[in-house]
Amino acid sequence: MSAMSLRPDVLSARRVLAVQPHPDDNEIGAGALIARLRDQGCDVRYVTVTDGSMGTMDPDMAPAELAGLRRREADAAASLLGVSENRHLGHRDLLDSPMPGLRAELMQEIGEFRPDFVLTCDPWLPYEAHPDHRAVGMAVAEAVSFLQFPHVPGAPKDAPAQPVVAFYGTAQPNVRIPAGPYWQRKWEAVARHQTQFPPDALIQLRAFAESMSQGEEGFFEPFKVLHPFFLHFNPAAVLA
């Protein structure tokens, strides 16, 4: 059994659950892939775990007001990529981590939607300081790992097959997916998050991303794609 044989092609996905810690993470990490999958007819559903209410440096911006703005921005960005359903779980940004019940919530989301792939942020990213990113990525990995164990809290009664996990925002990618014409749409979607990225900040973010994602055939998005086989007691995961 080789690592390659256990690395299904995410571009062949038919149903993808994209789980983001904050309202802008899916677009930043995987916006081009999501747009491409939707154009191919793949069914994509978002799950947004936190309300993003701490994401401001403005002392006059009330958290509740920001949460409302960010929810509207998130739905607009998803819509631009062709995603019509965004499930907002409503956890408080930063304040609710480590979110001990999140694994069970995500097991229910996976059980209901029955995806063949789950997209989320890589909780093993070195030096990741945001607890929401660590908590959400790990909760996704745990939810996939324990999905078919009926006595684990949150396990669905009619558990589907375990989906493959594609981690974005990773330092150890094993797949680099060419963005092609979807690169521009990705950044149009990121631009919908106006509370997070005023024009100057958006220009800087895009320039940095392009400096890190330039391949021989144009820009790409990197992912660590892991079959569930690699999510427990498997040192080969780092090489997968």
Regions found by a protein language model. Give the residues of each.
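Active-site rim/loop-helix segments in enzyme catalytic domains that contact anionic ligands
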Residues: M1-F113
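Metal-dependent de-N-acetylase/amidase catalytic core
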Residues: M1-V19, D96-A240
